[in-house]
Regions:
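Auxiliary Fe-S-binding modules of radical SAM enzymes
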Residues: 1-13, 19-20, 193-275
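Conserved strand-turn element in the central/C-terminal portion of the radical SAM core barrel
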Residues: 158, 171-191, 246
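Active-site beta-loop-alpha junctions enriched in small/polar residues
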Residues: 88-90, 121-123, 143-147, 184-186, ...
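Structural preference for beta-strand elements that scaffold enzyme active sites
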Residues: 82-84, 115-117, 139-141, 178-180, ...
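Surface-exposed amphipathic alpha-helices with a cationic face
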Residues: 107-110, 133, 169-175, 259, ...
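Short, electropositive alpha-helical surface patch
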Residues: 99-102, 137-144, 191-208
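Conserved Radical SAM active-site core
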Residues: 1-139, 149-150, 162, 166
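Active-site glycine- and acidic-residue-rich loops that bind
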Residues: 118, 123, 187-196
Length: 275
């Protein structure tokens, strides 16, 4: 059966729109959807939100259709702060084209001119460039895990291609919207090839910074990763087992090497996320 026909899409009502964020640089989190159909094997959102539903993660999405109304009220009441859009979901996954929850939330934010930071691995963010560009304080982050689209298809089967994301970065630059790159999680044996060319393009389109993130083996991640590795790259299983049970020196060196490649490409601000 085609995945498009297996996806369960539901509408739900949220109790609140904004939650306090513990992420650096963010005051609030806004997640227009629950679940995500990008089906990234390394996703740790199910563990973060303590998901225990019957549906397989990646096969369902719930649209929080009342979020824009709730948000309009909360923006009037809460202290002003930076809103991180898409901290445990992708705000521009395919469901957004039908529901436009993210877009309608942006419309409310624009009225109050609150600062935002969007994170996505979808090129569909470019459809809202007209709205985003009207905000005085904004930033958009695009996620990458590899320069190789074949490897991307293994790990992120239903996300935008590498070339589509690069075009999105270029479109953001052309619109004058500050953009950064979230490179991660770093996947041993899969992340290294072609990075010089990838980072050179990112420097060319003036990304503000690159954040290099580590692979976090939250509950459920290894269970999704292992079958893919066993089928495609069984030689890499020991490296992932090592990361699963700690942070070995060679993995830390890999993170440092990737950060160094980004700096050598001309990106001045490069940070490796802490464990």
């Amino acid at each position: 059966m085609d995945k498009e026909h297996r996806i369960k899409v539901r509408e739900i009502s949220a109790r609140t729109a904004l939650s306090r964020s513990r992420l650096s640089g963010l005051d609030y989190a806004l997640n227009p959807y629950r679940g995500c159909i990008h089906a990234c094997l390394y996703c740790y959102s199910p563990a973060v939100i303590h998901y225990d539903g019957a549906d397989k993660w990646g096969d369902f999405v719930e649209a929080r259709t009342n979020l824009p109304v709730l948000l309009a009220h909360e923006l009037r009441k809460l202290p002003r702060g930076v809103i991180g859009i898409g901290t445990v979901t992708d705000p521009y996954q395919p469901a957004e084209r039908g529901y436009r929850v993210t877009r309608h939330c942006l419309e409310q934010i624009l009225r109050r001119q609150w600062p935002i930071c969007i994170q996505t691995k979808s090129a569909a963010v470019t459809e809202d460039i007209g709205l985003i560009s009207q905000l005085r304080e904004k930033e958009v982050g695009i996620t990458f895990t590899t320069a190789d689209d074949t490897l991307r298809a293994w790990m992120e089967p239903d996300a935008s291609t590498v070339s589509e994301r690069l075009k999105a970065l270029e479109a953001l630059k052309d619109a004058g919207i500050p953009a950064f790159v979230f490179f991660g999680p770093v996947l041993p044996g899969l992340a290294e090839e072609g990075l010089e060319r990838l980072f050179a393009f990112m420097a060319q389109v003036s990304v503000t910074r690159v954040l290099v993130d580590r692979l976090r083996m939250h509950p459920g991640v290894w269970e999704r990763l292992r079958p893919c590795l066993a089928a495609n790259r069984p030689d890499l299983l020991p490296a992932y087992e090592a990361v699963r049970f700690g942070s070995p020196e060679d993995y830390e060196q890999l993170l440092a090497d990737i950060a160094d490649k980004a700096r050598r490409a001309g990106i001045s601000s490069v940070v490796v996320e802490r464990p």
